[in-house]
Amino acid sequence: MSSALLAATALELAVLAGHLIAYPFGLTPERPERRPPPRSPAPPTGTGADGPDGGEAAVHAATARGEAHPATALPVATAVAPPVVLLHGFIDNRSVFVVLRRALTRRGHRHLESLNYSPLTRDIRTAAELLGRHVEEICARTGHSRVDVVGHSLGGLIARYYVQRLGGDRRVRTLVTLGTPHGGTAVAPGAGIHPIVRQMRGGSSVIEELRGPAPGCRTRFVSFWSELDQVMVPVRTACVDHPDLDAVNVRVTGIGHVALPVHPTVAAAIREALEAPEATEDNPEDTAEHTANAAGSSPGATSAA
């Protein structure tokens, strides 16, 4: 076992131990707040991560199509931020996003909402319908016409199904996925007893549906994948690879699957992705590769993936 994998495994265990303590506090659904649309966020203060670094990590971004181009910093938006919906992974809950919520709040994202779906949910399609109803309720309550979504692992797959198969692209501006098995994973513990786990395997009916055409999809995808993610097999299955989707794949080094939603380096890169301006005719989206320089408090190098 390499030293990098040993360090990442140790960090995974530490994160898991901390999450087990926080887990009970996320079991109950959060109470939605009725707020007016937020004001424009404060001017950006830099790209460093918030809070202490739990281990050295670097993130590298590459578009899902095309060759490498010179790396540039991810742009930061100045427009009013839409609500952000956080969607946890399998048998998890909203407590996994404590660090990310703090990072986004400090940046000026005032409207953050988490959705807990039941661990007894047996079908990704059913969970995607639940997400759709939740998004519609948020839009009606806040006056926003669109939202951003961040999904960890299975949560990202649920959100992608909503966007790509249930018309959710009219509501979701940006979908950020963290360690999500977009192409299906060979590691599926519990597949024999839980049907939703079987749907995450390569070749499942859900995965095949997502391979289908998606012309005109209006959602921008940003997928974070880690070369040390032992739940995603192969690791690049966590990348979005679809000719019809506007996608940027971000490579994370030094951490594994469990640490993705809680590591401050990743939180800073997610924050930048959510603050990127939407493409317009006057400001076409740059399809070149980007490098998110968010090495946190410990040294780290970034380069185009």
Q: What role is predicted for each listed range?
A:
Residues 1-85, 98, 102, 107, ...:
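Flexible, membrane-associating and regulatory peripheral segments of lipid-active enzymes
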Residues 80-82, 215-221, 244-248:
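Short, proline-enriched alpha-helix->beta-strand connector loops that line the catalytic pocket
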Residues 84-95, 101-218, 224-225, 231, ...:
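Serine-dependent carboxylesterase/thioesterase catalytic core
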Residues 100, 233-240:
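Short alpha-helix in the alpha/beta-hydrolase fold that links the catalytic acid
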Residues 111, 243-258, 270:
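Catalytic histidine neighborhood in serine/cysteine hydrolases
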Residues 124, 256-264:
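Catalytic histidine-centered segment of alpha/beta-hydrolase-like enzymes
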Residues 227-233, 257-258:
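Acidic catalytic loop of the alpha/beta-hydrolase fold
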Residues 261-273:
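Post-His helix in hydrolase/transferase enzymes
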